[in-house]
């Protein structure tokens, strides 16, 4: 892993490994509310350990049988007895006569099994067609966007769930893992043109993507990653790409140059944020947005490292939000480490080193191996 060039900071690799390992062991009762999010906890932990060069397939491969139990096949009560499948976040959510699988837990589980190198599962066990049919049913026919789950009574896309760029990314990533590569592959299961139309409708006037014409770093990364998986980045105009790059570069907070004069004028300016990235304009820096912004820049231009100050963001992560006592990364320098920010902080550092695939959010070496071994 990378090391800050200025100052004594370095990555406390052993403590980060222990931090992620703790989340795969017995968690305290305060985490009971997250029981339905077990697949997310496993993904963030396995991803973090993989970034820090832990052989997770050797260390946790014995638990693949337990992981596989979360894969549920359901026969819908329709005229065609349609079979769909996906993952539940926890076995307590495997409720008879109710469709409780959802897109996020399905993607978290699939990515975790890729990192655990359970290639036998993808090649011989996973019913990719029924899984793709579930993704298809989550698409809103009127907008082209996706919801995360089905109505447990009607088995149509949930009418109360939100639909946004996050779920569009998750849906396309699942189909990509299932073997979809060309537009024709995706068209077999979803209305790709309508999806592309929805993504384009989320473009903001000053660059980037977001709802209600307010650009957001996380949504921008989701939109660009979705377009990349669909091989459709060329649909963006050169002007929009340039505007988006400019907007993303302006999200890197600096205590140098003109920005230092904001200290008394901007309530959202904090000098200690120097080098970090904010998710929106007039917000404080946040560890996770370092990844979302850097991944977006990486997808837009091969010169991204020359445009942004990677040394400063590295120093920000290592000096400000890395927890040298407990391991992990926090949202900012005032809070404790949490699993989400620890994973994305580690991913940002790995992305700078060229060791992380931002499109699927897994280490590059694992992505390469999966692509080679599982050619559907």
From Swiss-Prot:
Coiled-coil segments: none
Catalytic activity: geranylgeranyl diphosphate + L-cysteinyl-[protein] = S-geranylgeranyl-L-cysteinyl-[protein] + diphosphate
Cofactor note: Binds 1 zinc ion per subunit.
Gene3D superfamilies: 1.50.10.20
Location relative to the cell: Cytoplasm
Protein EC: 2.5.1.59
Function: Catalyzes the transfer of a geranyl-geranyl moiety from geranyl-geranyl diphosphate to proteins having the C-terminal sequence Cys-Ile-Ile-Leu or Cys-Val-Leu-Leu. Acts, among other substrates, on Rho1 and Rho2 and CDC42 proteins. Participates in a RAS-like C-terminal modification of proteins involved in nuclear division and bud growth. It is involved in bud positioning and cell polarity. The beta subunit is responsible for isoprenoid and peptide-binding.
UniProt record similarity statement: Belongs to the protein prenyltransferase subunit beta family.
Protein name: Geranylgeranyl transferase type-1 subunit beta
Organism: Saccharomyces cerevisiae (strain ATCC 204508 / S288c)
Gene responsible for this protein: CDC43
């Amino acid at each position: 892993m990378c090391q800050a060039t200025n100052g004594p900071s370095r990555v406390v690799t052993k403590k980060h490994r222990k931090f992620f390992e703790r989340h795969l062991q017995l968690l305290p009762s305060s985490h009971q509310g997250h029981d339905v999010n077990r697949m997310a906890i496993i993904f963030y932990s396995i991803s973090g350990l993989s970034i820090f060069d832990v052989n997770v397939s050797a260390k946790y491969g014995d638990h693949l049988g337990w992981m596989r139990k979360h894969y549920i096949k359901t026969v819908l009560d329709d005229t065609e007895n349609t079979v769909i499948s996906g993952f539940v976040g926890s076995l307590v959510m495997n409720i008879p006569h109710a469709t409780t699988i959802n897109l996020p837990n399905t993607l978290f589980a699939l990515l975790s099994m890729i990192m655990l190198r359970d290639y036998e599962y993808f090649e011989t066990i996973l019913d990719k067609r029924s899984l793709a049919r579930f993704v298809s049913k989550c698409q809103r026919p009127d907008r082209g966007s996706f919801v995360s789950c089905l109505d447990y009574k009607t088995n149509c896309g949930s009418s109360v769930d939100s639909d946004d760029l996050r779920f569009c990314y998750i849906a396309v990533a699942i189909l990509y893992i299932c073997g979809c590569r060309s537009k024709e592959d995706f068209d077999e299961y979803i209305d790709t043109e309508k999806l592309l139309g929805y993504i384009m409708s989320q473009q903001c006037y000053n660059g980037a993507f977001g709802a209600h014409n307010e650009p957001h770093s996380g949504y921008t990364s989701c939109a660009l990653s979705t377009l990349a998986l669909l091989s459709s980045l060329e649909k963006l105009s050169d002007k929009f790409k340039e505007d988006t790059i400019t907007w993303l570069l302006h999200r890197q907070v600096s205590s140098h140059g003109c920005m230092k004069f904001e200290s008394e004028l901007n309530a959202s300016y904090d000098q200690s944020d120097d080098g970090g990235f904010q998710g929106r304009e007039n917000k404080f820096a946040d560890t996770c947005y370092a990844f979302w912004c850097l991944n977006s820049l990486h997808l837009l231009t091969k010169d991204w490292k020359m445009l942004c100050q990677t040394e400063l963001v590295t120093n920000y992560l290592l000096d400000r939000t890395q927890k040298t006592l407990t391991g992990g990364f926090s949202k900012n320098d005032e809070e404790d480490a949490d699993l989400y920010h620890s994973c994305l902080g580690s991913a940002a550092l790995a992305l700078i080193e060229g060791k992380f695939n931002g499109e699927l959010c897994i280490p590059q070496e694992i992505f390469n191996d999966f692509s080679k071994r599982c050619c559907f």
